[in-house]
């Protein structure tokens, strides 16, 4: 093996999404990630690996079938490591591990008390999360300027449970939230075409299935209605990659994604890789 260049990479994203959970939740937010990567050549191709930090912030409104509306804010911050092997044949493998903390708050004026009256109540919650992903794909050159990338990914996230005490007119009731596990499988394809030495456009389609994603809670030992995002979603993406003009310039990827199914909405991202 022989050492190659290092790189600093970053990603910024944001959007507005609706999650259909038996009822539904609307979420608006943004996320940031930045890390350092090192590339090492090997007999099969090239291995890239490195650490990263991540941060995200959002606001949400949830609507339950019983007419209960709640509003809140959430943020997360964590660290992770990632690795990707790109083989000379076009086949690649990738994976990542993440760990961090998520803080959230919730407020509603629609909860029903024992006297059957709507009351104003709120709570704050904080818990750890961890996650991992594995992926495999193959990049095939269709002609001199066009490539196809067919891939499959498995993504897992676990958020620890928490016990929260209702504030306001919630009368100090304790909600015990179970841990939440999300396991998603995604298969997709992306076709990219180089329009010049510096510019490449791409379009992609993907199918995603959430196997779990159920959020359970108990109050006074009784289970409450459990929202779940189990089910299918579809993704359509468009983007443009701008290659560096000079030796010290970054590669910039600008993308737009549209979702339908269990997840509905629009997101966008700007990613960069600065090699040195």
Predicted features and spans:
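Solvent-exposed flexible segments
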Residues: 138, 148, 153-161
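Outer membrane beta-barrel transmembrane domains
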Residues: 80, 142, 167, 171-276
């Amino acid at each position: 093996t022989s050492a190659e260049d290092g790189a600093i990479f970053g990603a910024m994203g944001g959007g507005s999404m609706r999650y259909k959970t038996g009822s539904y939740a609307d979420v608006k937010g943004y996320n940031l990630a930045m890390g350092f990567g090192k590339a090492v050549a090997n007999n099969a191709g090239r291995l890239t690996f490195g650490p990263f930090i991540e941060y995200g912030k959002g606001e949400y409104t949830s609507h339950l079938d019983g007419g209960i509306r709640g509003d809140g804010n959430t943020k997360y911050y964590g660290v992770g490591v990632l690795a990707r092997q790109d083989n000379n044949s076009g086949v690649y493998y990738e994976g990542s591990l993440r760990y961090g903390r998520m803080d959230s708050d919730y407020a509603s004026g629609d909860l029903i008390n024992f006297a059957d009256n709507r009351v104003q109540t709120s709570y704050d919650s904080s818990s750890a999360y961890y996650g991992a992903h594995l992926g495999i794909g193959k990049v095939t050159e269709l002609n001199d300027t066009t490539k196809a990338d067919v891939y499959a990914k498995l993504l897992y996230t676990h958020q620890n449970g928490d016990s929260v005490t209702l504030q306001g007119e919630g009368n100090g009731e304790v909600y015990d939230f179970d841990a939440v596990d999300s396991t998603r499988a995604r298969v997709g394809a992306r076709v990219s075409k180089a329009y010049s030495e510096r510019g490449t456009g791409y379009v992609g389609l993907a199918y995603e299935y959430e196997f779990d994603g159920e959020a359970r809670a108990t109050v006074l030992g009784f289970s409450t209605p459990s929202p779940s995002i189990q089910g299918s979603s579809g993704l359509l993406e468009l983007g443009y990659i701008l290659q560096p003009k000079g030796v010290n310039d970054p590669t910039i990827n600008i993308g737009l994604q549209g979702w339908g199914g269990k997840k509905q909405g629009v997101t966008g991202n700007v990613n960069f890789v600065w090699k040195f």
